[in-house]
Amino acid sequence: MDNTIGYIHSTESFGAVDGPGLRFIVFLQGCNMRCKYCHNPETWFTLPDEKNKAFLESHGIKVEERTAEDVLKQALRYKSYWKNGGGITVSGGEALLQIDFVIELFRLAKQEGINTCLDTSGNPFTNEEKFLEKFNTLCEYTDLFILDIKHIDEEKHKQLTGFSNKNILDMARYLSDNGKDMWIRHVLVPGITIGSTSEEYLYELAEFIKSLKTVTKVEVLPYHRLGLPKYESLGIKYPIPDILPPSEKQLSKARQILCCIV
């Protein structure tokens, strides 16, 4: 496929949470992880796989194939709203699965003087030379990385997402060592990332974040169940039906532990 073509799940014209200022958000299709609390399961299915395409279309979901130039042209309509630090954010799905497209989009954006931000789980990151060569190019065009750390414990992370967190933590260290600004995000899930009587994993995560030199913000987001109807419509069993959102007390405690680091 043309490496400047992206599989676009959707776009958002005035995003206010995925990076500084108002953002034009590009949500890319496809993700390898299967986070038990994911609220966008329709973004899992990678393309151009024909079975995945047929499945999505049978549920009324049409993913667009677009060039980076075309997406940038759409984004530029909103440039006048970015005077206070806004710009373009690419999210997912998992944006790094379409790294060639992101590189091209951000390269074009930087030519226009636009702030760029990548929201990622870090799951595709690897220290292999072939990937790092592309990742280093991406770093040249990326002003901010938002890294979602699902769980600090490797085994718990596997249970939660289906994957180890080793490469994700490696990515955080790599960004830190190479002077790339990042925000850290963490979703608070009762019984999974915070225990009923213990915050040990939050303290472990806090220690890891303290070891990073370029973290400028830490966000703790409460788990929610807003994605349940999507699972039902796709015929996918919801993995954690009995888990409720965190209490205000739990959320406040988690933010006290994590958000005061920077």
Model-derived features: where do they sit?
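Short glycine-enriched, charge-decorated loop/helix-capping segments at active-site entrances
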Residues: 44, 57-61, 158-164, 235-243
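N-terminal [4Fe-4S]-dependent radical SAM core
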Residues: 1-65, 77-84
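Flexible, glycine- and charge-enriched loops at secondary-structure boundaries
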Residues: 28, 61-65, 161-165, 195-199, ...
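Conserved AdoMet/S-adenosylmethionine-binding subsite of the radical SAM
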Residues: 72-87, 92-221, 226
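Short, electropositive, low-hydrophobicity segments enriched in small/polar residues
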Residues: 23-25, 34, 96-97, 126, ...
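Auxiliary Fe-S-binding modules of radical SAM enzymes
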Residues: 1-20, 73, 188-262
